[in-house]
From Swiss-Prot:
Superkingdom of the organism of origin: Archaea
Classification via InterPro entries: AAA+_ATPase (IPR003593), ATPase_AAA_core (IPR003959), DNA_pol3_clamp-load_cplx_C (IPR008921), DNA_Rep/Repair_Clamp_Loader (IPR050238), P-loop_NTPase (IPR027417), Rep_factor-C_ssu_arc (IPR023748), Rep_factorC_C (IPR013748), RFC_lid (IPR047854)
GO molecular function: ATP binding; ATP hydrolysis activity; DNA binding; DNA clamp loader activity
Organism this protein belongs to: Aeropyrum pernix (strain ATCC 700893 / DSM 11879 / JCM 9820 / NBRC 100138 / K1)
Binding-site list for ATP: G47, P48, P49, G50, T51, G52, K53, T54
UniProt keyword Phosphoprotein present: no
Alphabetized CDD domains for the sequence: AAA (cd00009), HLD_clamp_RFC (cd18140)
Keywords associated with the record: ATP-binding, DNA replication, Nucleotide-binding
Protein name, per record: Replication factor C small subunit
Any one biological process term the GO annotation gives: DNA-templated DNA replication
Keyword ATP-binding: yes
């Protein structure tokens, strides 16, 4: 392979046109209408990471402009280039350049637009008005509420949903078989649980795990540096049985063996609290979720990982005794 990008499966298997996108059908059908009409408004793509927002923008540009679409598309990552000067200079210069044949506009793609400063967004709003005859803007955001109302009102809104388990696993299976990777079906399930509908993350995990040989559940959790769900459930079950010391030992083992932060452990605990495989009264499950929220907040604020998570296990142990679990 001639470049690093060609070695990355997430790039190798990225859809090139709208016809190649098998998910987000409600979005794709509307975008195809823009291609058919050879015209489009400003667009705002919103949704969680890895759901195909940037891919859809590139596929739309490809179908409008052809193989050389990149010369008619200015792509900026707003989280890296938030300043008002970027908006005023780069976008203004590109907007004034020549338009492609047959299509009367070019495209400015602003990825992570929700990270732009308020001043930069105000400047963008004015540029959108000034160059709307020759330029269309596609804004990509994880949190559309951070986009100022005057910009939102000028855009057609598209919400990208987290990908279904079936869509993610089918894609992973296709890639694994195409690359000649030996894998366990349970490992694909584990990758989906870890990625939470983020296709980009899922493909990257699959590729990383493939370097260890057969893609197994153990290999998957090893490459992402996460504890296996059964290990977290064992820790919680031990606390529920009233053995705080043993539960805390399991906590220490998890954090040291996997190098996990307190926030990472808290997120895994939260996931396992709602697992049907963890047996606990519904009342305690609700109370535990509420208390874990407080622990997570303190961890985010910088509190000590070991102290906060040990406190959670101590609380769980005491509550289980009180409720006679």
């Amino acid at each position: 392979m001639s470049s690093v990008l060609e070695m990355l499966w997430v790039e190798k298997y990225r859809p090139r046109s709208l016809d190649d996108i098998v998910d987000q059908k409600h979005v794709v059908e509307r975008l195809k209408q823009f291609v058919k009409q050879r015209n489009m408004p400003h667009l705002l793509f919103a949704g969680p990471p890895g759901t195909g927002k940037t891919t859809a923008a590139h596929a739309l540009a490809h179908d409008l402009f052809g193989e050389n679409y990149r010369q008619y598309m200015l792509e900026l990552n707003a989280s890296d280039e938030r300043g008002i000067n970027v908006i005023r200079e780069k976008v203004k210069e590109f907007a004034r350049s020549r338009t492609p044949p047959e299509i009367p506009f070019k495209i400015v793609l602003l990825d992570e637009a929700d990270n732009m400063t308020s001043d930069a967004q105000q400047a963008l709003r004015r540029l959108m008005e000034l160059y709307s005859s020759v330029t269309r803007f596609i804004l990509i955001a994880n949190y559309p509420s951070k986009i100022i109302d005057p910009i939102q009102s000028r855009c057609a809104f598209f919400r990208f949903q987290p990908l279904s388990k079936q869509d993610v696993i089918e894609r992973l299976r296709y890639i694994a078989e195409n690359e000649g990777v030996d894998y366990e079906e349970e490992a694909l399930d584990a990758i989906y649980e870890i990625s939470e509908g983020d296709m980009r993350k899922a493909i990257n995990v699959l590729q990383a795990a493939s370097y260890l040989g057969k893609v197994t559940v153990d290999a998957v959790y090893r490459v992402v540096g996460m504890a296996k769900p059964r290990e977290v459930r064992e820790m919680l079950a031990t606390a529920l049985k009233g053995d705080f010391t043993a539960a805390r030992s399991l906590l220490r083992k998890i954090m040291i063996e996997y190098g996990m932060s307190g926030e990472d452990v808290a997120r895994q605990i939260h996931r396992e609290l709602f697992s049907t495989e963890l047996k606990m009264p519904e009342e305690l499950r609700v109370l535990a979720a509420d208390y874990l929220g407080e622990v997570h907040y303190r961890l985010v604020e910088g509190s000590d990982d070991d102290i906060q998570l040990s406190a959670f296990l101590a609380w769980l142990t005491m509550m289980s005794r009180k409720l006679e679990v």
